[in-house]
Structures are given as C-alpha cells and as structure tokens.
Amino acid sequence: MATTVVPGFIPSRSGFRFPNAFPDVPLRRIGIPGVVSVPIGDASNGLCGGMAFAARDYFEHGSSPPADATPPSEGPLFDYIVDRLVDSFALPFGPARYLELMNPVLPDVETVWSRIGWAPHGRVWRMGREEWPKIRADIDSGHPSPLGLIRVKSTDPFDLKENHQVLAYGYNLEGGRVTMSLYDPNRPRSDHVTLSLDLRASGTWTATEMTPSGAPVFSFFRVRYTARTPPSED
C-alpha cells in the first residue's frame, strides 16, 4: 500500500479501460491522397508510452479517459495516443537512453572504476541516485511520473519494442526499499501494480519484478513529460 500518492489518481478510474493490445494497423500513412498510401509502423507492437502520457494529460485536465473497453484502430483517440507515443520517445535522442540502459556491457552495480569516476555508473546507481529523486519529486508535487522500463539486455535496436512505459503515482519508502505504485497500460483497471527497488543494493543485484505480472525490470528512468490537451469526446 502506497503511503504517498498523487491525490485523486487511481488507475481504475484515471487510466484507460482498454489494454495496450491494439490491432495490427499502421500508426501512420504517408503518400499522395488517391494515388498511393504507404503504411508506417504497427500499432500491435504496443502504444504504452502514448497511453501513459495521455492518461496524465486527462488527469491534469481534470477529466477521465473515454470509457471504451476496446482499443481503437482509427479516429481521434487513436491518433492522439500515437502522437503521445512519439512524444514519449523524445525524438531524436530519446531512444538512445533505452539503448544505453539495454546494453549488456553496462554493469548492474558499481565497479572499482565507476566508483572513482573512470567508468559509467551501473544501473542500480542510476536508478537510486539519478532517477528515483526525480520520480519522487513528481509524485510529491502531485504529478504522476512517466517511467521507461528496461526489460531486455540487448544491443539490437529492434529489441526496443521489448521495453515498456508506465506511470508512477505513489510510493512507499521503508528503510532503503522503495515500492512504487503504477498505472500499467498492459493491466487496465488494476490498482495493485507495483515496482520495487532496494536503494541499498551495491555488491550484488538481480532484476526487480513488477507485481503481479512478475515481468523482470533491469532498469528504469523518468521520462521527460510535456503536456498536451486531450481530444474532446464530442
């Protein structure tokens, strides 16, 4: 149970009712109307970042997302979620953040060289020292905090789609262990998704897990959020 929460944010009411399980349709089409239309992207790969950003948009505009239980395949809401997905990647440099943290060469914990500044800090140091304070500041100031979750170690850019995005809206800090409460687009209407990290981990560390899914998370970081006005339902 989170002891500090964003007032009024509850995933079952503040998140989308449908899951991050979109049909196999292109994200965009480019071309000449009536002559050629080329499909770009595939919604079935997931739009979690767009859903996380959009959920915060609706919340901060004092409204709830549409009550639809089926993911859209076209129309204003679909286009809006796709636009927010693009925003969540902070192009052109945003994907490099994922690739850096996915790289198997990056250590999980500190090494002799990283402790003296001669090598990059490991994943645990970055989560605890760099990312967690920013996430906590968001929540303490009443804002859900978008997180990028690293769920694969790989140098293959095509594995970017294996990662995930969520919204942290609460936390419990006990000793050196923090447990964050999350809105997970993969688990609509669930108020019980959490992610934990032992901030004291140093010598050894294993991937933390999201509950109740049990999915491994090798690292996380706060995603820079920019606000947009959600579409009208009219």
Give the positions of each predicted feature.
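N-terminal low-complexity, Pro/Thr/Ser-rich intrinsically disordered segments
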Residues: 1-14
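Polar low-complexity intrinsically disordered regions
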Residues: 1-4, 70-73, 81, 232-234
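Cysteine-nucleophile protease catalytic domains, especially the papain-like/related folds used
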Residues: 11-129
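Structured loops at beta-to-helix junctions and adjacent beta-edge loops in soluble globular domains
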Residues: 21, 51, 150, 183-185
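Short loop/turn segments at secondary-structure transitions that flank enzyme active sites
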Residues: 24, 54-59, 153, 172-175, ...
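Sequence-level detector for tyrosine residue identity
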Residues: 58, 80, 98, 169-171, ...
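Active-site-adjacent substructure of cysteine-protease-like catalytic cores
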Residues: 124-182
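Cys-His-centered catalytic/binding microenvironment captured across papain-like cysteine peptidases
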Residues: 159-163, 172-234
